[in-house]
């Protein structure tokens, strides 16, 4: 079955270093869902400047909960009921589309790429940008489902291991935005440093300048119990997520040092 891709739109097509571009739903959704924060940009008519907020969110499908990352998914964003973005989303219509237009992005750093000259330095990274229209979720069943989805995106199974479901006050004070995605793109860099031919032929520079990649990843430390914690041991689901997550991110960072297959990724 062919891999689904987002359509290339003028606002979503990668122009510079476009050999690094990806439009695969699976790739883009994977980057978004692996990031602890999603940067959400919107325009408020009361301000001369676009607003950008770091938010917590996750891609999923209420209609098809078993859908995988390569399927068509919505982005669910979690926020306070009376925040500026939530208020705008309740009343916004744009060009016939229902909801407020949003641009959303996420980036994962995999390494520092150190070259012979400052101009050739880079990062190994995975970034994604999505464009869509957001409306508040009003159906209570979908809202509860989305709250569980977002909570478990922070720590898997955390929702089931807390007092749940949310009480009435919590439901009233929390809003969930559902973003229907119109387009998206990803940009990925992996591999070693690459320098200009002139610098590569400069033996003096090459003799004194270390070049290579410093892999980088998010590392979770040992959990520290809260002052009113009464659970003697760190729960197994939490420790498993921490240990396995650390190892997975470490593996990905070192994997990114390898040169990409020609024609697959830019450098």
What label would you give each PLM region?
Residues 36-38, 102, 175-177:
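Structural beta-strand/beta-sheet cores of well-ordered domains, especially the beta-sheet scaffolds
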Residues 1-11, 138-267:
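C-terminal edge-of-domain segments
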Residues 34, 49-51, 98, 126, ...:
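Residue-level preference for beta-strand/loop junctions
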Residues 41, 58, 105-107, 133, ...:
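Residue-level recognition of well-ordered beta-strand positions that form the cores
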Residues 43-44, 59-65, 85-92, 192-194:
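Short regulatory "switch" loops immediately downstream of catalytic or recognition motifs
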Residues 65-74, 80-146:
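Short, structured beta-strand-loop surface elements
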Residues 29-31, 67, 92-96, 167-171, ...:
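A general structural signal for short secondary-structure junctions and capping/turn motifs
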Residues 2-79:
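An N-terminal domain-cap segment
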